[in-house]
Amino acid sequence: FFNSLDVYFYGSFSLMALMPRLDGVVMKRFGDAILAVNNNRRRHHEYVNLPYADLPDPKLEGPRAVRGAVIHDLGSPFDAEPDAYDWHNVKEWKDLAPKYVLMVLRHYVKTQDKQNLQDCKEAVYAAMQYLEKMVNEGENFPLTHGTDDTFDNLSSHGISVYCGSLWIAGLRAAAKIAELLG
């Protein structure tokens, strides 16, 4: 996959240090994809062995792009469109939105490129609002319900320390971005 966001989150420090403008472009491309809408439906391969499952079920199939949902990647050699990963429905993943927000803020802290921050602002807010919709009434964290984070082969249920800590960090980073942009 091209620029798998979850792997990029951990591996992009060297790119940031050596080619910060390229890192900024990657943040903008993810921002464009986060704001995109593509209603083409696709079945997620994790569930391909359930050909008779009732549809539509967001675990089984769904639209390619939903505004605010942070995608997995910017395409692949076999599928040039963003979010080529189709094993799981990544629109349910709880860790991608805060990772994106943290990377946008990190880029600004390193480069002081306020224009890049401005260019990504709408995607930052849309991503956090999308994830906030997954917080159940009376709860403070988006709960996990199986394989809905980037540890996609490990199932967890309820409050995840991993996703919860990213949620808090993402909220703080989004607030800092709002403060920086006035």
Task: List PLM regions with ranges.
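Short, conserved phosphate-binding/catalytic loop or strand-edge motifs used
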Residues: T144-F151
